[in-house]
Amino acid sequence: MGRELTRSELLFEASDAAARLRKVSLRGDTHRYTDDEVFRSAVAFLWLRYAEPLCQLVIRRLVGDAARRAWDGMCDIRNMLAHERNQNIDFAALWDELPTTLNLTEAPLDRLLADS
């Protein structure tokens, strides 16, 4: 088992994943997301890559109350994706809510990165 990432490392990982998710959201559309299994899997993987560090920051209480409130739901997403419970994952919502979720969750991330 590897070492736990530091707060700064987790913030950087989340920021990098958010940038990749935003880039993918600009390249795809609902039709591609619906018809392309590989694209859909890539988006789910990037969601997991984004949600994991945010969830770790929340669980380990490495961030304040405002960030914990903003990111609390990311742990549910991480748990669903990490345990591959496909029947519980609303893949369409992962795509449809991508811009809104990034807009809501990136603000605390940007503030914390600026303070690091």
What do the predicted segments below correspond to?
Residues 1-116:
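Solvent-exposed interaction patches of small proteins and small membrane subunits
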